């Protein structure tokens, strides 16, 4: 565990999208890796842990849990713990406009046999499972381990693709603000608008790439947050116009609100054929 902690400390200097432990990881090391992942995500970093499903799920958007006991590669059995790194690599390589659902795993010749209802139950239970269609093995549905929707959260946060888009935005905002803005500009309204313009430009790029729905993205100085900050700091706002509140000095604080609609991938189809 000490060696793992030291290794995790070293990789904190890098940007990590997906991480998986070694096949021989102990329970204590697995718990430490989970703890590290959640702590990093609390700091607006974006690692996602791929690990074997245990008796209880992690119930977190940053944890993907592989529940497979019947994988074969030729005549060789493949364990979930040894295959998590492969899944992490697959997920890391999915283009931003696509999902991992039905991502092929051609080296596997067999996966855990499940009925249709068992497949659906596993997916609904936050487990990443595999299916074999008679031609090749593939990921059944790209879901993470989240089961409990947090306050302010949405059902589609259970999807790896949606969380990946959220993490793209989180990564951009964090690295841009930390690298280009903190301590580098006077805190004026005009300079806040420079940041707003940068965010909007990035959102427009994501719209072109199919990550965000075109025309719905926005970024602006947060009027409500400015208003509340001014009142909390003893400023009489009763005679101020909306624009005056937006332009008022806010010390070291910059309040921005932004958003957009994340686009999901095509995964569920209904096609009707009329025999004329």
Which sequence ranges carry the predicted segments?
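Extracellular Cys-Trp
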Residues: 1-104
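Structured, hydrophobic secondary-structure cores that serve as assembly/anchoring elements
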Residues: 91-110, 118-276
């Amino acid at each position: 565990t000490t060696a793992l902690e030291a290794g995790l400390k070293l990789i904190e200097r890098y940007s990590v999208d997906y991480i998986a432990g070694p096949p021989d990881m102990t329970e204590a090391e697995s718990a430490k890796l989970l703890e590290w992942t959640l702590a990093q995500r609390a700091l607006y970093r974006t690692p996602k842990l791929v690990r074997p499903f245990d008796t209880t799920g992690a119930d977190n958007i940053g944890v993907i849990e592989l529940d497979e006991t019947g994988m074969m590669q030729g005549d060789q059995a493949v364990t979930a713990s040894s295959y998590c790194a492969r899944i992490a690599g697959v997920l890391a390589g999915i283009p931003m406009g696509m999902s991992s659902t039905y991502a092929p795993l051609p080296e596997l010749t067999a996966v855990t046999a499940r009925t249709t209802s068992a497949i659906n139950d596993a997916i609904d239970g936050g487990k990443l499972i595999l299916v074999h269609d008679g031609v090749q093995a593939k990921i059944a549905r790209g879901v993470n381990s989240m089961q409990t929707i947090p306050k302010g959260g949405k059902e589609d946060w259970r999807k790896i693709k949606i969380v990946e888009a959220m993490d793209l935005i989180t990564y951009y905002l964090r690295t841009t603000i930390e690298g280009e803005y903190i301590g580098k500009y006077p805190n004026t309204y005009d300079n806040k608008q420079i940041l707003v313009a940068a965010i909007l430009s990035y959102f427009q790029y994501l719209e072109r790439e199919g990550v965000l729905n075109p025309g719905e993205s926005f970024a602006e100085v947060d009027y409500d947050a400015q208003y509340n900050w001014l009142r909390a700091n003893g400023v009489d706002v009763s005679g101020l116009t909306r624009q005056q509140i937006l332009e008022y000095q806010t010390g070291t604080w910059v309040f921005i609100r932004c958003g957009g609609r994340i686009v999901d991938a095509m995964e569920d189809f209904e096609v009707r054929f009329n025999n004329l």
